[in-house]
């Protein structure tokens, strides 16, 4: 009887070992849902070191609210549910000669969309973890615009145009070249420019000060109107 049990165990062990558990494969094609949404995202995968090609292999995800399907040529991890060769699932991705690992700093997370694109054709999102005051979230576009959010400030830059909102300093600033418009928490507004500053109204223009008002020019000052009233 004991010999029979041993034989059965050996047969079961042999069957389990013969079943595929996981492997690496290269994506041959990517399938997307149709207009009716009847089909799910899936890939045709050619297993490495094997002649097997699996069609329409479904994708797994760590969160049902996100999706990042691979591209043709990507190397993926394929696992077989319950060791069933007819039930493959793509469970992960592996960096390869087609897509190399990007450089990240310690404590930093980088998301590149799309992952296979070059630097001039992708969006980069960087997140830096840390204690309160040192966290950073940054989005960069290949054409130059950048948005950076820290615990204390928000900064947006497009070319020479820079907008900063500083929570600790209680100040918001928009600048370009030598021109700056600044607002602080006390209600003070400052406008400065290295060259000309022009204010033009299509209708009426009113300037009123509850306190003193000073107008000063190092050169010529000109007043022009159909009628000038001085009170």
Per-segment meaning from a language model:
Residues 212, 217-231:
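Proline-poor, low-complexity alpha-helical tail modules
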Residues 1-193:
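Hydrophobic packing positions characteristic
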Residues 32, 188, 196, 204, ...:
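Short, glycine-/Ser/Thr-/acidic-enriched flexible segments
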């Amino acid at each position: 009887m004991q010999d029979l049990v041993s034989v059965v165990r050996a047969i079961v062990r042999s069957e389990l070992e013969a079943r595929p558990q996981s492997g690496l494969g290269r994506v041959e094609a990517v399938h997307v849902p149709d207009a009716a949404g009847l089909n799910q995202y899936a890939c045709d995968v050619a297993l490495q070191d094997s002649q097997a090609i699996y069609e329409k292999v479904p994708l797994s995800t760590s969160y049902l609210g996100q999706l990042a399907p691979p591209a043709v040529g990507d190397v993926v991890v394929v696992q077989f549910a319950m060791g069933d060769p007819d039930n493959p699932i793509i469970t992960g991705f592996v960096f390869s000669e087609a897509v190399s690992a990007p450089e990240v700093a310690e404590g930093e997370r980088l998301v590149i969309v799309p992952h296979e694109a070059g630097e001039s054709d992708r969006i980069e999102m960087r997140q830096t973890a840390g204690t309160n005051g040192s966290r950073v979230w940054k989005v960069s576009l290949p054409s130059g615009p950048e948005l950076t959010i820290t615990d204390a400030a928000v900064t947006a830059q497009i070319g020479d145009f820079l907008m900063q909102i500083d929570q600790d300093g209680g100040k918001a600033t928009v600048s370009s070249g030598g021109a700056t418009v600044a607002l602080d928490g006390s209600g003070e507004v400052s406008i400065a420019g290295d060259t000309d500053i022009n204010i033009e109204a299509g209708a009426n223009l009113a300037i009123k000060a509850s306190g003193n008002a000073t107008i000063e020019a190092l050169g010529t000052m000109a007043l022009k109107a159909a009628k000038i009233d001085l009170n």
